[in-house]
């Protein structure tokens, strides 16, 4: 949990090796990119003429060409790489879940919606969720609970679970577990 002083270092410098380790970049291999990882990153298969003219126009206005927006500088204009290879999107599900298909340690619940994280004694122990029919379920973890619900739903789940700004949680009748 960001802001939690548990000794974890979530700085750019600390997490970069993990990003490099997950990446399989077909063009860039340097201090910012990796190869051989699960996430396939490549240049667009085709760059249309309109996009080329746009980049040239912005360069004519004085912006530098940037061949790597995930490199040392994010300033400039250029063509972004994509998380795909040979026209197939390299999603987190494709990269990390597909290899675990059939693994008894993993259970996927499709067409289910997480409602809150179950907290016991200040520790996440599971998830409360509803299936497609609206039936309420709880799943408990044997180890850790990893929340990867995206940029919008992750904070929503945390707040519905009592993790967030205490005043805001109380306004909505949610018991405060952690004031962030």
Each language-model region and where it sits:
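Conserved redox-cofactor binding core of oxidoreductases
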Residues: 2-124, 128-130
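Glycine-rich loop(s) and the adjacent beta-strand/alpha-helix scaffold that form part
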Residues: 117, 126-180
């Amino acid at each position: 949990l960001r802001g939690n002083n548990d000794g974890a270092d979530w700085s750019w410098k600390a997490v970069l090796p993990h990003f490099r380790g997950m990446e399989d970049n077909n063009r860039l291999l340097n201090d910012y990119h990796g190869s051989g990882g699960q996430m396939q990153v490549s240049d667009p298969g085709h760059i249309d003429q309109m996009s080329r003219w746009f980049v040239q126009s912005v360069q004519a206005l004085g912006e530098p060409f940037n061949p790597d927006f995930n490199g040392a500088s994010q300033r400039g204009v250029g063509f972004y790489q994509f998380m795909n290879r040979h026209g197939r999107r390299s999603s987190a599900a494709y990269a990390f879940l597909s290899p675990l298909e059939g693994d008894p340690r993993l259970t996927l619940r499709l067409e289910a919606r997480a409602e809150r994280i179950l907290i016991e004694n200040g520790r996440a122990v599971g998830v409360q969720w509803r299936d497609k029919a609206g039936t309420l379920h709880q799943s408990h973890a044997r180890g850790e609970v990893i929340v990867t619900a995206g940029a919008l739903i992750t904070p929503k789940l945390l707040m519905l679970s009592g993790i967030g700004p205490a005043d805001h949680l109380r306004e909505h009748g949610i018991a405060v577990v952690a004031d962030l």
